[in-house]
């Protein structure tokens, strides 16, 4: 997966570096047949996510999305649930019309209002310091507010574990 968090100007703004063009060039030059893009959606980039998905369609093999988590509780990057639901409806329409969004429809629906129960022990996280954390990667780093979570990998695996075959 390669993180692409917006079209050129937005991606560069969020990353605080002029790197978008280099990221896309490296993807296009790669011989790897299955490069995937991952979009972390936030209050800055949400309006252009459908255009970003359209742009990435011919650049990568597939696309996954998740939502930014507000690490400091009052975080200007957190996208409220009304905008989240409206955007997810647009992402679902793109997926249904053939765009390579790899998130399941069940997961995209569940992320709208977070009416799902996380089974976090199913996920292991490799941390930058080399340690491994089992479960939510916020454990030990933050006070966790599951109601504001938007981590789609946790959504997918939790729905599947609980018997949702559409996840």
Regions found by a protein language model. Name each.
Residues 1-124, 128, 137, 141, ...:
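Radical SAM enzyme [4Fe-4S]-AdoMet core and its adjacent flexible, acidic
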Residues 132-133:
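Hydrophobic "anchor" residues
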Residues 140-155:
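A short, polar/charged loop-to-alpha-helix boundary motif
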């Amino acid at each position: 997966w390669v993180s692409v968090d917006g079209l050129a100007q937005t991606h560069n703004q969020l990353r605080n570096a002029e790197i978008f063009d280099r990221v896309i060039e490296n993807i296009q030059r790669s011989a790897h047949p299955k490069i995937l893009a991952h979009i972390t959606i936030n209050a800055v980039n949400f309006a252009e996510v459908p255009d970003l998905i359209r742009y990435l369609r011919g650049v990568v093999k597939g696309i996954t999305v998740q939502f930014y988590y507000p690490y400091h509780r009052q975080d200007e990057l957190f996208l409220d649930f009304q905008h989240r639901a409206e955007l997810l409806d647009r992402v679902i329409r793109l997926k249904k019309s053939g765009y390579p969004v790899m998130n399941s429809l069940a997961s995209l629906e569940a992320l709208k209002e977070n009416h799902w129960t996380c089974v976090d022990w199913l996920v292991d996280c490799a941390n930058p310091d080399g340690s491994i954390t089992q479960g939510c990667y916020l454990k030990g780093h933050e006070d966790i507010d599951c109601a504001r979570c938007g981590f789609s990998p946790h959504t997918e695996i939790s729905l599947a574990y609980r018997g949702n075959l559409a996840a």
